[in-house]
Amino acid sequence: MTIFSLKSRIAGVFLGALCILPVQAQYEFNPSATGQSKVPTDPRNRAKIHTELGSMYFQAGNPGVALDELRIALSADAGYFQAYSVRGLVRLSLKEYDKAEDDFRQALNLAPNDPEVNNNYGWYLCETGKERQSIAYFLNALKSPLYETPDKAYTNAGTCAFKAGDFDGAQNYLLKALQLSQDGAVSARLQLAKIFYKRGNFEESRIYLAEALKMMEPPTADALWLGLRLERKQGNRAGEGGYASQLRGRYPTSPEYQEFLKGNFE
């Protein structure tokens, strides 16, 4: 998965985004300062604010600045587990796997039952080749009655079960994500389209892909590549050409387009 794709999950744009703190910093006005000045009131609040800033910078494609903000957060409050969890995601995107593991472990030590920490660590495991191990952490996240976005953990569980070759488990998780989602579950729909494609159920795959594409602007290279292969399987050369044209125009350097040029359709 690309760094952009990971950040998209965090931002809630695609598929099963990883869950981090909402970007809603809390400030109090300093009565001794001007009306324009805002200062955080305590170490925990400072840690929260800088963690949220780190999340924002990461989503905006500035991992270096994000790490600076998270360092400030942890300097303010070394026990603020959310900062470790978010820093783990940033380091995962930078392929600093050992450091990411350390951050997630620290977050889990501080908050072993926190749903967001479990979800994020599960994604780390999935992205580092431990797909089967990741499922337990997604399911642990789902145990919390206070978890506000269980559809994300179900989507991640489905995505990782699919990567592990467990098509039945993946399908069940993704269908649960659809039931619980309040934002259309575009990622879950795309993953279901992939599962049905692998199973040879091309009509069902087409339905889920069409639903996912309606929610994407622009469509991802991944979705266009699946659409191209679906049309090819069904002998629709015009449809295949349309997807190929979009893939070439939008993502000429993508791995998907390179596979197309090589004729590797599976």
Residue ranges and their predicted role:
Residues 52, 86-89, 120, 156, ...:
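Canonical tetratricopeptide repeat
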Residues 27-43, 214-266:
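Terminal, low-structured helical/coil segments at or just beyond the last alpha-helical repeat
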Residues 42, 76, 110, 144-146, ...:
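Structural marker of alpha-solenoid helical repeat scaffolds
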Residues 40, 47, 81-82, 115-116, ...:
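Helix-start (N-cap) detector for alpha-helical repeat units in TPR-like alpha-solenoids
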Residues 59, 93-94, 127-128, 163-164, ...:
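Register position in tetratricopeptide repeats
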Residues 24-71, 75-77, 260-266:
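N-terminal leader/linker segments that initiate helical-solenoid repeat arrays
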